[in-house]
Amino acid sequence: MEKQIAIELMQEVLKLTAQLNVIIHKIQEVSPEADRLSLDRHMGPMMAACDEHLFRPILKHYPELDPHR
């Protein structure tokens, strides 16, 4: 993976996860509870998939791109 592509991908992954966090917070406003739980149960796996299949592979090649460092 070329570094410039990794940089651009990381920027997009960070935007994506930020947007998923907005969605997670909005889901907390959903009623009834059954609907909220149905939506919410899918958010964890989506965040995990972003981490496992996007974030970590980029950092494997370019650990210096880790925004948490």
Language-model features: locations:
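Short, charge-rich amphipathic interface segments used for partner binding and complex assembly
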Residues: 12, 30-66
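N-terminal acidic leader/helix
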Residues: 1-31
